[in-house]
Swiss-Prot record:
Gene label: rpsB
CDD domains: RPS2 (cd01425)
Region ranges (Disordered): 230-292
Keyword Ribosomal protein among UniProt keywords: yes
Cellular-component GO terms for this entry: cytosolic small ribosomal subunit
HAMAP family the UniProt entry points to: Ribosomal_uS2_B
Lineage: Bacteria, Bacillati, Actinomycetota, Actinomycetes, Streptosporangiales
Family: Belongs to the universal ribosomal protein uS2 family.
Listed PROSITE patterns: RIBOSOMAL_S2_1
Name listed for the protein in its UniProt record: Small ribosomal subunit protein uS2
Amino acid sequence: MATVVTIRQLLESGVHFGHQTRRWNPKMKRFIFTERNGIYIIDLQKSLSYIDRAYEFVKETVAHGGTILFVGTKKQAQEAIYEQARRVGMPYVNQRWLGGMLTNFSTVHKRLQRLKELEEIDFDDVASSGLTKKELLGLRREKEKLERTLGGIRDMNRVPSAVWIVDTKKEHIAISEARKLNIPVVAILDTNCDPDEVDYPIPGNDDAIRSVSLLTRVVADAVAEGLMIRSGGAPGSEKGAGEPLAEWERELLEGKTEAAGEEATPAAEAPAKEEKAQAPEEKKEAGSGEEA
């Protein structure tokens, strides 16, 4: 199989930065490489193998006619979810998850039909509509609300074959609904998450914009490859290069997990992160988005 993503790309996107050590789920211990300045560092060798596994699942699911629902409503994920899902023609939810979106899909589908009916109305043609300006205004507002909440799944005619989740803690309702319907969950697992909730986990940073964007792009690439296989095309692959790595980052790159307990040189240490509640920056990388 061609290289899906390199460890260098994961490092440069900050995928390895976990939460502060006091904010973790012990079930994530097996995915943790070491700790630096009170922050857990995720083992990217394991992330890489789990990415390959998730990639193959998504690719095969789509190749056999399946649909992947992209879900990420936190600020750091909204743009990536929107762009990547639209790039590969998949449904998405990036604003607000409505309870019952999966478990009560028959009702949701009726609202989608209502949205399509409203889209047929010419709100600027008052004369031929047979409605008053006030009535048209009310219908326009109804349409805008439906577009905002359901626009991303406008063309989804049945529940998806699988869901891609950014931040399993924030999207716990979506995960709960998917599990009730036995819909496979593919998701980023940060160090504070529960791996038992996810079928195809990707250990990584679910708060940094670059990390979320990279991993969501990888999932979208898997969808694209699956679509090409479905249509009989020949998929390609991408590779990346980067800057020199710090010593402790090279340990990750080389898979030296036995070095987890060793001290890094001052220049090699990751900068300490503050609690997200105390700072507007993301917990993991300078210049990233805010916590949703």
